[in-house]
A protein has these predicted regions:
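Conserved ABC transporter NBD signature motif
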Residues: 58-66
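Conserved ABC ATPase signature
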Residues: 110-111, 136-140, 144
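Helix-to-loop junction immediately C-terminal to a conserved catalytic motif
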Residues: 50
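The feature captures the beta-strand-to-loop junction immediately N-terminal to the Walker
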Residues: 35-37
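Catalytic Walker B motif of ABC-type/P-loop ATPase nucleotide-binding domains
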Residues: 161-165, 170
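Conserved structural motif at the start of ABC-family nucleotide-binding domains
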Residues: 4-6, 18-21
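Conserved ABC ATPase "signature" region
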Residues: 99, 114-132
Length: 194
């Protein structure tokens, strides 16, 4: 399992410092929360850790190796990122959309194999959507869409999963179910919330 270390990270947009000198460690099998009010830079920090945007100073280490030493494909195998406003492609079936999370790991000849289909179904089951695997994404509710993109992140199979506001659009029952699922996953989980 992957240990994440964020060391004195600073993120700037233009000349404005958004995140300044942030350090923390996220341990394998634990859920680490980045908490703060809207607009303080939580999403910017998470996107920088994931490599979606660059940090200006400091470092981010995965098991002691800087994330800048990994190629984008290597990072995609090591960490999954689910953004705050992500939504599934409306013209895809739910199972097809979740299968996109498997892209960094599978070879073209593996598409459709029983083991791949099982991973997709299991990821959907973790968020309570396996019964909707053949439903078009544009027929999902807001909460189902949110759980669907989280299932795609889980299907990626990375040891580290980063979730930006994962409980947005979820009712209390599904919020609790999701948090229990993440705690039980054994993955290193970093999530933002307010």
């Amino acid at each position: 399992m992957t240990r994440l270390e964020v060391c004195n990270v600073q993120c700037r947009i233009n000349d404005r410092v958004i995140v300044d000198d942030v350090s923390f460690t996220a341990e394998p099998g634990k859920l680490t929360a980045i908490v703060g009010v809207n607009g303080v830079g939580k999403s910017t920090l998470l996107r920088s850790i994931a490599g979606v945007r660059q940090f200006n100073s400091g470092d981010v280490l995965l098991d002691g190796t800087s994330v800048t030493d990994y190629t984008p494909m290597q990072r995609a195998r090591l960490m999954a990122f689910v953004g705050q406003e992500e939504s599934p492609s409306p013209d895809l079936l739910l199972g097809e959309m979740v299968a996109l999370g498997r892209t960094p790991h599978r070879k073209p000849w593996q598409v459709g194999q029983r083991s791949e289909r099982r991973i997709i179904r299991d990821s959907l089951a973790l968020v309570g959507l396996d019964h909707l695997i053949d439903r078009r994404c544009d027929h999902l509710s807001g909460g189902e869409r949110r759980r669907a993109v989280i299932a795609r992140g889980l299907a990626q199979g990375a040891d580290l999963i980063m979730l930006d506001e994962p409980t947005n659009h979820l009712d209390v029952r599904h919020q609790l179910m999701l948090l229990d699922t993440l705690r039980a996953s054994g993955q290193t989980v970093v999530a933002t919330t307010h």
